[in-house]
Amino acid sequence: MPVPSLSPSATPSPSATSKAAAPKEDGDEAEDKPAARRTGKGGPVPALDRVMLGSYLALGGKSLSESLALRRRQLGREQKIVHQFWGWSERMPSSVSIGSSTLTVSWHGTKLAPVAGGARDSVIEAAAKRLAAYRKPMLLRWAWEMNGDWFEWGGPNNGRDPGLYVTAFRRIHRIFRANGADNVAFVWSPNWNSSPNTSANAMGKYYPGDAYVDWVGVSGYDFYSESPSTLFRPVVSAYGSRKPIIVTETAAIDHGRGSKASWIGKLSAYVRSTPSIGAVVWFDTDVQDDSKHNFRFDTSSDALAAYRSMARSARFSG
């Protein structure tokens, strides 16, 4: 789980984890794709019966607009989601130049007790007003991977009390709604596995409740050859019948012998067979400060071909 840090220009860093070119999809480029239909879920960002495919883009030596243009040329399509990371006290954006793409903001958390107790309400209100001014429907992922021990807002670093996270999340939700940020869809997004992996730190302990969550997210990377099913099925099984699922961070590293292309093919197949997944966001960067890994999907011609095949398939035309 890389964690990009502050502001959209800062590089995040992938989530902590435990540890051959894909075939053409049926009807790939020439496919006549009917319009996607809404599923009735997702709040301000409605889930469709097709997958929205997007990315966190931080390509070395390129601006966001240059990176978007490169991916447009390579894939023959737009990013449906553009993911950015913003610090807890940073001034949130009220406008972003990403065309028709849906903005996803991962908003860093902070120590939980002051948030839960109201001492950080002014920060929350300022963020709510800025994002309300954005006006367009967008996704907000606050204090992600709370079931891990690598962030200051993680439950294990806050008295091992998941209830503090739940209270803080609900408070933020209420303040956003009170300040007119009705365009903001709330994403609750644990890591695929918990650290420590104990019953007291189980991801479900941190769930704020259906009334406070529009989408359920999950972070999971191919660090140790885990399959997409291994990474995402626990969240899909627990929440997929109630909320649309967004894979908020994922990517593969190259283990050799075409492994990245093969894994992308497996990701495509898993998502195509999992109707509750409504969005997938690739962690598309080669400048991760705390990692030697290159998460770009164009590190080889076969990996690019596999990703292009996925991006052009009907299931990913949301």
Named regions from a protein language model:
Residues 1-51, 312-318:
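N-terminal low-complexity, Pro/Thr-rich disordered segments
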Residues 42-123, 252, 281-282:
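N-terminal substrate-binding region of glycoside hydrolase catalytic domains
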Residues 49-54, 58, 137-139, 144, ...:
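Substrate-binding cleft of secreted/luminal carbohydrate-active enzymes
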Residues 69-77, 90-104, 126-136, 205-211, ...:
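Acidic (Asp/Glu)-rich catalytic clusters
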Residues 79, 203-226, 283:
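Aromatic- and acid-rich polysaccharide-binding/catalytic face
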Residues 91-93, 97-102, 106, 218-256:
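Glycoside hydrolase catalytic-domain groove-lining segments
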Residues 92-190, 294-302, 307:
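Substrate-binding cleft of extracellular glycoside hydrolase catalytic domains
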Residues 169, 173-201, 244-255, 279-285:
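Aromatic-lined carbohydrate-recognition surfaces of secreted/lumenal glycan-active proteins
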